[in-house]
């Protein structure tokens, strides 16, 4: 059966498809004015259901436990990622609906997906299964006008006819998006890795035409306002993406409709973009993040010219593919997502395989422009260890201004490169690129090395050896403010200030955490001083079996 629903007048329970006419047996259901009344819970007639098993695939899908105020558009949007929705029947009195997909394959994919991921509408979990009926046929009764208008509006958008979708006639006829904004407010929670404007554009443009994006930080949260060409696309994106992670276990999307109906973008840069106005100025003389990152990665530009192919969302976001299902013409979150190469560093936490970056050879970094008088394998191990588990370090014997650093994998290498490239170490800005080497070779026995090659494969100082470690949540770019932890009770503020100024650095500020005195923030005179202090003092023995832990902080004092 499609599920159990109470019969309002009689008080018995029966399969919901019994709402349909007794004359229907595995055939189309023709919606008449009388049965429309029944479908809305206003008639107590009993109908005999057919004998088909609800587990048998059908183009018609039965949806239960809908919120009382659900709109036609919200119901339609459940099916949109899987293909064209060809018909809709709303049973509002029963908090149920039936939708008909264009193909049985699309319906099968949809049911399989929602079996694994429970859909939520307006905060309420809903239930989806195959209907006993192979086809829905509806008449022109007034009760169906809203559903048909919403279907017409959505399908016109899918076919590119935005004029019809935007027409007042479609809205007035009951388009579910009436009065709804095409602007979404997006909050990215657990932002352990950078999420750029272009990453957002690639993700959200899979649901419709993105016109404008503005990104900003509010209440210490990365947020964005994103405007679609139409509210149907906004609804589709919200239903498909809200609560999903961009990368594994982090960067969670929280999406609501904005009160704004349009965005006013003045500048095209890494913070805001109007895709309808490529002529807008950048607003400052600094190169945009796009250009900087593209240069760092040796790429001509951030955006991939190819369509969505290559890297995918994490397995939780790619259930149809993981299950071996075919998803034809998927316009939603289930289609493969190509992450721009310059955003590769952001994918480190998710271990997403990015074409051209995920090979074993790409876990080795070439670090150049080092200070040959001061560089040591240990200093590079500590610094690069902020962004991953360093396996080996080799300072080149005949060219000590160059070194090779081997990370645990390619994604950690990308993360370290994106955060450290260009920062000053021992007075010189370091340059970091991917090495052509697949691994760092240890010196042969008897080979002169002067201790310039070190193997750290089993180091106890690895920050990320435990899966799901909280250290993944505390990876930030180098900054003048350092986060200190594992401080014993006997150590005072003055003790730490003296310690951090002992190597010539200037301590500009200090603050213990109010709720946990084992942690503190300390602000150095510059980012370069903070980098040096981290190298010198991470794992410093403070006594009482406490070794100081030092990392870069996102906060300031």
From Swiss-Prot:
The modification Phosphotyrosine is found at residue 127. It is found in: Nucleus. One of its GO terms (biological process) is neurogenesis. One of its GO terms (molecular function) is mRNA binding. One of its GO terms (cellular component) is nucleus. It holds the Pfam family RRM_5. Keywords: Acetylation, Activator, Isopeptide bond, mRNA processing, mRNA splicing, Nucleus, Phosphoprotein, Repeat, Repressor, RNA-binding, Ubl conjugation. The modification N-acetylmethionine is found at residue 1. This is Polypyrimidine tract-binding protein 1.
């Amino acid at each position: 059966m499609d599920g159990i629903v109470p019969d309002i007048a009689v008080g018995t329970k029966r399969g919901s498809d019994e709402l349909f006419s007794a004359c229907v047996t595995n055939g189309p259901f023709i919606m008449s004015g009388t049965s429309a009344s029944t479908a809305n819970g206003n008639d107590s007639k009993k109908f005999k259901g057919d004998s088909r098993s609800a587990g048998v695939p059908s183009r018609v899908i039965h949806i239960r436990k809908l919120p009382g105020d659900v709109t036609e558009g919200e119901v339609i949007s459940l099916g949109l990622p899987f293909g064209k929705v060809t018909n809709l029947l709303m049973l509002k009195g029963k908090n149920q609906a039936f939708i008909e997909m264009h193909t049985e394959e699309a319906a099968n994919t949809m049911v399989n997906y929602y079996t694994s991921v429970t859909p939520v509408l307006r905060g309420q979990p809903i239930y989806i299964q195959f209907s006993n009926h192979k086809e829905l046929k509806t008449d022109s009764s007034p009760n169906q006008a809203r559903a048909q208008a919403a279907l017409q509006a959505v399908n016109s958008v899918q076919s590119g006819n935005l004029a019809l979708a935007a027409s007042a006639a479609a809205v007035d006829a009951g388009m579910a998006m009436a009065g709804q904004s095409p602007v979404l407010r997006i909050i990215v929670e657990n932002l352990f890795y950078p999420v750029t404007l272009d990453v957002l554009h690639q993700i959200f443009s899979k649901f419709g035409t993105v016109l404008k994006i503005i990104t900003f930080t509010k209440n210490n949260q990365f947020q964005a306002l994103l405007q679609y060409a139409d509210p149907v696309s906004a609804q589709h994106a919200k239903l498909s993406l809200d609560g999903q992670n961009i990368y594994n276990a982090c960067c969670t999307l929280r999406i609501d409709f904005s009160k704004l109906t349009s965005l006013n973008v003045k500048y095209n840069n890494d913070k805001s973009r109007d895709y309808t106005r490529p002529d807008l100025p950048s607003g400052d003389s600094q190169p945009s993040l796009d250009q900087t990152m593209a240069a760092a990665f040796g790429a001509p530009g951030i955006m991939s010219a190819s369509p969505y192919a290559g890297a995918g969302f994490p397995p939780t976001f790619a259930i149809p593919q993981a299950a071996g299902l075919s998803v034809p013409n998927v316009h939603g979150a289930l289609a493969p997502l190509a992450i721009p190469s310059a955003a590769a560093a952001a994918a480190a936490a998710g271990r997403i395989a990015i074409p051209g970056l995920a090979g074993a050879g790409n876990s080795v970094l070439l670090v150049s422009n080092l200070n040959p008088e001061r560089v040591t394998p240990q200093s590079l191990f500590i610094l690069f260890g902020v962004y991953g588990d360093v396996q080996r370090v080799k300072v080149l014997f005949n060219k000590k201004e160059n070194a090779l650093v081997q990370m645990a994998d390619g994604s950690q290498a990308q993360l370290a490169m994106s955060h450290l490239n260009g920062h000053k170490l021992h007075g010189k800005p370091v340059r970091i690129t991917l090495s052509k080497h697949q691994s760092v070779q240890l010196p042969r026995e008897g080979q002169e090395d002067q201790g310039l090659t070190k193997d750290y494969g089993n180091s106890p100082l690895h920050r990320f050896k435990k899966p799901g470690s909280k250290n993944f949540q505390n990876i930030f770019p180098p900054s003048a403010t350092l986060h200190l932890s594992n401080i014993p009770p006997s150590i005072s503020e003055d003790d730490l200030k003296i310690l951090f100024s002992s190597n010539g650095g200037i301590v500009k500020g200090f603050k213990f955490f109010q709720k946990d005195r084992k942690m503190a923030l300390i602000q150095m005179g510059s980012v370069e001083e903070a980098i040096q202090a981290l190298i010198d003092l991470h794992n410093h023995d403070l006594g009482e079996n406490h070794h100081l832990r030092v990392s870069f902080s996102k906060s300031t004092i």
